[in-house]
Amino acid sequence: MLRTFVTSALRSVCRQSPAASSLVPLVQRTQRATLMTLSRPCLLPTPSLASPAHHQLLQLPGVLAATGTPSNTRNVTKFSLVKGKRKTVKAVLKRFKRLDWGAWIRTHSGRQKKLFKKSAALRRRLKQHVFTNATQSWLLDKMVTSYWRRPKHFINDPYKPYHSRNEYYATQSKTFKV
């Protein structure tokens, strides 16, 4: 709710500010509404926008990065411009698979490159999948919406044996006596 309020407030302030009119098409083109990009030009007090030096500084985002303030890196969490809700990063769905118990698996990088140079043991290991660690799983869960975090049951799923985790007591599948 706070995110929706902030984005709507930023949108209304940006509509009123004449200096921020050149920034709005940039945000709409990239479809990223990060708070860092929108808050700098729009939330400055209006008297400071009167000087031409500030107006020129606001139009050049590269100047802000050169002055020592942190530049906008690729923020993996994206937000919609209309409601401010999180969006799913499509590269996560393409490269990773989420298991029902919360872990993410992926294939080895470079598993199909220059196989003639690699030993037979390495080629065998490259065919196997790798689990992500807890930090990576937490980040990947943030990058997808709740729809993709829910368990999905597909017909003839090759990952079906890996969706249940039976080595711990808390996650063992329970058998019922009839």
Swiss-Prot record:
- GO biological process terms on file: mitochondrial translation
> Which GO molecular function, any one, fits this protein according to its record?
structural constituent of ribosome
Q: Where in the cell is it found?
A: Mitochondrion
The cellular component terms of Gene Ontology attached to this UniProt record, alphabetical and capped at eight, are: mitochondrial large ribosomal subunit; mitochondrion
Say yes or no: keyword Secreted present: no
Q: Which domain of life is it from?
A: Eukaryota
Gene3D superfamilies reported in the protein's UniProt record? 4.10.410.60
Q: Name one Pfam family in it.
A: Ribosomal_L35p
Keyword annotations from UniProtKB, A to Z: Mitochondrion, Ribonucleoprotein, Ribosomal protein, Transit peptide
The principal location of this protein is mitochondrion
Family membership, please give it: Belongs to the bacterial ribosomal protein bL35 family.
Protein name (Swiss-Prot/TrEMBL): Large ribosomal subunit protein bL35m
Organism, by scientific name, is Drosophila melanogaster (Fruit fly)
